[in-house]
Amino acid sequence: MKKRTTQAKKSGQNTNIRDVFPHVVRSNSSQSHIGKKVSSEQSPTPDVTITTKTLDERIKEDDELSKEVEEAWNQIMAERISEPIHCENITKVEFILHHFDTTARYGPYLGMTRMQRWKRAKNFNLNPPETVGKILMLEEADEENRKRESLFYDLQTIPG
């Protein structure tokens, strides 16, 4: 592998990924991942359409969790002095999760995900909201949707 790269540098040729990894499947290739020829009529995997639900859709389907979210929302709003500013585009679920992120009574929040923070607070008997735990344990609240990451998870310094 290294020998091929040094030879390409000596000869003045540019090395690309296809030279380094010749057996890797490419989308425009007619080879499967095990190196066997596949005709254009055959498909190595069946075409499957996967419908993904958003977190809000999933919560609306679950009546019990929907009621808990509504109760948590009402409880948070009762504690507040005024209406939240700049929350027109935030759903109730996102607002509850943001409230959990910014509430100091559940321990430190920098450098950990919401799930890690919730579990830590549970282990230290800080009584984190069960509603937040149920929301975070839903499949739709995975890392890809960034719901498990806290508000401050990828906090970066401001340049300048």
From Swiss-Prot:
Location(s), subcellular: Nucleus
Predominant cellular place of this UniProt entry's protein: nucleus
Region (Disordered): 1-48
Record field: compositional bias (Polar residues): 8-17
Pfam family, one: DNA_pol_delta_4
A biological-process GO annotation: DNA strand elongation involved in mitotic DNA replication
Gene Ontology CC entries for this record: cytosol; delta DNA polymerase complex; nucleus
Any GO molecular function: DNA-directed DNA polymerase activity
Superkingdom of this protein's organism: Eukaryota
Nucleotidyltransferase in keyword set: yes
Annotated keywords: DNA replication, DNA-directed DNA polymerase, Nucleotidyltransferase, Nucleus, Transferase
Record has Nucleotidyltransferase as a keyword: yes
Physiological role: Appears to have a role in the stabilization of the DNA polymerase delta complex.
Subunit organization: Heterotetramer that consist of the pol3, cdc1, cdc27 and cdm1 subunits. Interacts with cdc1 and pol3.
Similarity section: Belongs to the DNA polymerase delta subunit 4 family.
The protein's name: DNA polymerase delta subunit 4
Gene (name only): cdm1
